[in-house]
Amino acid sequence: MVVVAAAPNPADGTPKVLLLSGQPASAAGAPAGQALPLMVPAQRGASPEAASGGLPQARKRQRLTHLSPEEKALRRKLKNRVAAQTARDRKKARMSELEQQVVDLEEENQKLLLENQLLREKTHGLVVENQELRQRLGMDALVAEEEAEAKGNEVRPVAGSAESAALRLRAPLQQVQAQLSPLQNISPWILAVLTLQIQSLISCWAFWTTWTQSCSSNALPQSLPAWRSSQRSTQKDPVPYQPPFLCQWGRHQPSWKPLMN
């Protein structure tokens, strides 16, 4: 057991008293259960700034030459116990902080899930309402289109009106019908002109192919006699072939090396 008694006034030079007791004391020769008083001298030469409560100076490491091995072991054990307890306290505080963070995050997650569910329900209701409005506006657009065709050339509604919005929100089937309507309005005489142009192109192409074939067949017999005459002239007067000049190999050559038998 270690008991530390601090001095009442740190400015005084009174020493501190350490009472050490335990099993090592009996091993050293002292009676068991008897405390060993130890006088530790206080810090001498303290500056007036430290005595008056000013900035503390850097404390030098105290030498333990005046302590016995048993006292040093007890001091080391005490320091280890204090350090372990401090580490446990820090770990416990950290774990409590993390647990509180987990609880807060779970509460926030539950709030977000509830808000997400409400937003999904609201979105579903808006989608259903949007589909109903699209259907209503599509029927109104058909009625307005029929009225516009019956009246003829009238002033079209300005952009941003209810009728223009209805025309933009028509069903896909109505859009397909609107795309096919220009093809149905083509007059028959335009189709007739297109067919006549296609027929004229076909006839021109047929005439061109027959004319080129006839020209090629007429030019072939005229070119055959000329080709045959040129072949005969080359056969009658052939160009004399002169063999290349071959330099003889002998002693006059610089690389002449006869074989020695």
UniProtKB/Swiss-Prot annotation:
It holds the Pfam family bZIP_2. Changing I198D: Reduces endoplasmic reticulum localization of its own mRNA. The keyword Endoplasmic reticulum applies. GO terms for biological process: adipose tissue development; angiogenesis; ATF6-mediated unfolded protein response; autophagy; cellular response to amino acid stimulus; cellular response to fluid shear stress; cellular response to fructose stimulus; cellular response to glucose starvation. SMART domains: BRLZ. Disulfide bonds: none annotated. Changing S203L: Inhibits HM13/SPP-mediated degradation of XBP1. This is X-box-binding protein 1. The gene is XBP1.
